Amino acid sequence: VKKLLLAALMFTTPALADIELVVSKRHQSMEVYQNGELIDVMPVSTARKGYYTPVGTYYPYSLQRMHYSKKYDNAPMPNSIFFNGGYAIHATPRVNNLGRPASHGCVRVSPSDSATLFELVRQN
C-alpha cells in the first residue's frame, strides 16, 4: 500500500511493498517509509501564502513522467504523482526554495528526489 500524509498528508497505494510518504507542512519535509522503515527524508515546498496544500490521507491515482499545468501557464511538472485533483508531488528546478513554502499547492521536490519517488511509487 502506498500512502501520502500531508502535514500530516499521507499517501499509500496497494502494492508489493508498503510505501508511505509523510509530508510535514510545518517542517517542509517528506519522510519516505518502505514496509514501515524510514528510508529517506527530503526537503519539500508546499503552498506559499495565499495558496493551499490539502491535508489528509491520499492514494496516488495518476503518474505522469511529464505533465504541464493547465492552470499555471503550462508550467512543467516532471515526475508528477497526482493524489488529489490537480495536486501532485513533482520536481521543481527551483531547488533553492525547497525547505520553505513556495508552491501553488503541489508538493515540490528536487529533480533527483522526484525521480526516486516516481520509480518507488511506479514499481509498487
Describe the predicted segments one by one.
Residues 12-14:
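N-terminal signal peptide c-region/cleavage motif recognized by signal peptidases
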Residues 18, 48-57, 64-124:
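Exported/periplasmic cell-wall-interacting domains
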